[in-house]
Regions:
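Walker A/P-loop NTP-binding motif
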Residues: 53-57
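Hydrophobic anchor at the beta1->P-loop junction of P-loop NTPases
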Residues: 37-39
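Membrane-proximal helix-turn-helix segments that form the acceptor-binding/catalytic region
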Residues: 170-177
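Hydrophobic positions on the alpha1 helix immediately C-terminal to the Walker A/P-loop
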Residues: 48-51
Length: 177
């Protein structure tokens, strides 16, 4: 249902140009996120993210997380300090994004939903699960993440990334190394 919305660009061209323009028009909410932690890789990301979130919360730290995909409900993607965003808040944020009039991908829009709302929480840590194409992933908009955690990388995304070797997949997934 969300993917059929007229806001979204139907052809996916990976890159950061659209989301960076949106963030600029929104007055850079990503710059308000403290202690950004990126969890990068192909498998084990959710377990790593969830474990880290649990450890930080056990130390009485306020944490936000952004995961993809959601398993049962879109709200699972947006954890904001001990609670998930409501459907009403997600819809209201998408309406705010619509006003920018930028043809975004669904993932870019959902990343913006996270960033906009996380920027208002003032959490001590903001943990983002990053996708298969890290270098051009819409979560890759923070200039200086506190930590970048790399989980398992394998041949799972060879065809999706149009790569022939595991070394090429590693360059895309972990472009900072």
């Amino acid at each position: 249902q969300l993917a059929n919305h007229n806001l979204f660009n139907k052809s996916v061209k990976f890159g950061l140009k659209r989301i960076k323009l949106a963030l600029k028009l929104l007055d850079h909410p990503e710059k308000k996120l403290k202690n950004v932690i990126s969890v990068i890789g192909e498998s084990g990301k959710f377990t790593t993210l969830f474990s880290l979130r649990s450890f930080l919360e056990a130390s009485n730290q306020k944490v936000t997380t952004h995961v993809s995909p959601s398993l049962r409900d879109i709200r699972e993607r947006f954890y904001m300090g001990k609670k998930y965003l409501t459907h009403k808040k997600i819809r209201a944020t998408i309406k705010q994004i619509e006003k920018l009039n930028i043809p975004l991908t669904v993932f870019e829009c959902l990343t913006l939903v996270y960033i906009i709302n996380a920027s208002k929480i003032n959490a001590e840590y903001n943990i983002q699960e990053t996708g298969a194409l890290w270098r051009l992933d819409s979560n890759n908009v923070n200039d200086f993440p506190l930590i970048q955690i790399c989980t398992n990388i394998n041949k799972q995304h060879l065809n999706f990334l149009k790569r022939k070797t595991l070394d090429e997949v590693i360059q895309e997934d972990v472009g900072f190394m």
